[in-house]
């Protein structure tokens, strides 16, 4: 980090969420801490999630650890799938259901939820990327850890820069900042949406 700090002319720190230590790690683990807790509190026995993403892979691992069945909806057929995701789903006994490429994932997930509920399952639906009010708490907690670093290392972070995709990371950091009173510029880099759309998503999620 010394070279990067020198190049940027700033004291640059990195929060290593790739080393969160569960399954493949990453920021989604923070969200799953709260989402799995909520699922267990509601006595769910089945998780439903869409996409062959890092979030779905970590959800499959979490389901296995906590005794929850996991059903994953993915677009395309088996030959189209990411091999890493396939291996993870097989390793952790997640059931995979394939959808036509043009299928509406949200509608298909709702239909699957109803189907499993009719079979007597207690279903807990996971939003894409774990980005709902519960998952956002993972990054409210993360901001508390940033405050802890400030206290222990004696450094104040004037600017916190992060990727902003499904909005929960930025929303959680914003809420954590407001709760703690820690003054810092939060800079989210929108990775998939125009700034105006992403700003609206973050604000709505933070308000929940």
What are these regions (language model features)?
Residues 1-208:
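PLP-dependent amino-acid enzyme catalytic core
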């Amino acid at each position: 980090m010394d070279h990067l700090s020198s190049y940027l002319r700033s004291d640059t720190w990195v929060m290593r969420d790739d080393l969160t230590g569960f399954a493949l790690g990453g920021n989604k683990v923070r969200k799953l801490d709260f989402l799995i807790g909520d699922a267990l509190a509601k006595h769910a026995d089945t998780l439903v999630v869409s996409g062959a993403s890092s979030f779905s892979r970590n959800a499959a691992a979490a389901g296995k650890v906590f005794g929850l069945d996991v059903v994953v909806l993915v677009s395309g057929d088996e030959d189209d799938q990411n091999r890493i995701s396939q291996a993870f789903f097989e390793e952790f006994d997640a059931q995979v259901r394939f959808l036509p490429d043009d299928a509406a994932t949200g509608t298909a997930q709702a239909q699957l939820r109803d189907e499993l509920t009719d079979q007597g399952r207690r279903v807990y639906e996971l939003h894409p990327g774990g980005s709902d009010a519960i998952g956002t708490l993972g990054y409210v907690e993360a901001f508390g850890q940033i405050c802890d670093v400030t206290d222990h290392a004696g450094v104040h972070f004037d600017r916190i820069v992060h990727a902003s995709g499904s909005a929960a990371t930025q929303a959680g950091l914003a809420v954590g900042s407001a709760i703690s009173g820690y003054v810092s510029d939060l800079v989210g880099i929108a990775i998939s949406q125009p700034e105006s759309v992403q700003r609206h998503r973050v604000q709505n999620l933070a308000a929940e």
